[in-house]
Amino acid sequence: MEKLYNNIAYEPDASPSDAQNVPYLKHPPKIIDISVGRQLFVDDFLIDSTDLTPEYHKPKKFEGNPILFPETPWETDGAPATCPKSGGVWYDEEEKIYKMWYEGTWLKNMCYATSKDGIHWERPDLGIVKGTNLILPYENYTELEYHMPKVEYLRPDSTTVFIDYSAPKDEKYKLYLHNPGGCFPAVIAVSGDGIHFHDFALAGDMNTGDRSTMFYNPFRKKWVYSVRAFWSGRCRSYRESDEYLALAAQGSECERRWMACDDLDKANPYIGFPPQLYNVDCVGYESIMLGMFQIMYGPENNVCETGGVPKITELMPMYSRDGFHFSRPCRKSFLNASIHEGAWDRGYVQSVGGICIIHGDELWIYYSAFGGYEQSRSSVDTERDVLQRCNRTCQASPRRLCFDER
């Protein structure tokens, strides 16, 4: 049993996280340590009694969306895309600049962009491929060069980039990349500048689903794989390690079932597809782990390809005091798909690595969405990405932000 920073007694077990039965909410510690971070009333952990009803608000989408869209040849060579899926959008506290890692052209290129204000983005010439902002040109990565069997290229299907300020300078940036095409080990690496990566390794024997990601739990100092699994439709399994690169050595015995949709997640009445958990991204925020629960409302890929429309996924925030058990007290979509024909955010709304950035009294939440292309009926052209930002103003003092008002 592990005693956490807030006095929660955390004991890993084989049971998945149940959002309706969170152990520390049912049996909170008698004394709660509130010395770490600002305390947020996102659940009932800090409340002994009340006659108030929580109200959960939605963010206001930025009127200037989308803030990044396919323009360059390497973003339009195939199905056009500028999509951090999950990628990463961060404000680098040391360099005082916004940074973004995203997918340029659907399932093809890994790109890097910067911004002075988090809204207007530039594509710097990085010199890796002359005149471009490409950072991992997949044709340069061969089985011989990196000694990675069955991995002859690096193409982003699902990625995460995390900034680690506590690491040695040449390991400040952590990369997770899953190639498209099925269930097989992902690729991990580290970097000193977020551009030139090294120490590439396969993530052990982890035959993960294509939409797997990773994150860091700063309260327990654990690196976590958020693994796409299929034990309850699309769902999630969990692995953790003290050292990031050590995750590569883990076997499947280290994996635990983590979370899935439940009976409170209702189908979209116009689609009728049983909801499934598509992806999970998480980040440490103040005194909690903040997560984005991406629900898939359908339909399946073959139906979308036939109609030239994106599948419908939407985002729902979730909260944890131990990093494993998450509550979802509000089951309404936080960032929803527009769904209607012609909308550039018609569907496939997805969170980013890092989830949000503090900006004064606001949280700026970055996400990506797809418009579809009904004129096309091929699987290559069905999904056209745009990156968008929305921000949300909370009625609170700077940085004292929460997601419900009591």
Residue ranges and their predicted role:
Residues V352, E362-I365:
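Long, C-terminal catalytic modules of enzymes
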Residues C330-K332, V352-I355:
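Beta-strand/loop-rich accessory regions of lumenal/periplasmic or secreted enzymes
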Residues M1-Y278, V283-R346, G360, Y367-R406:
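Beta-rich carbohydrate-recognition and catalytic domains
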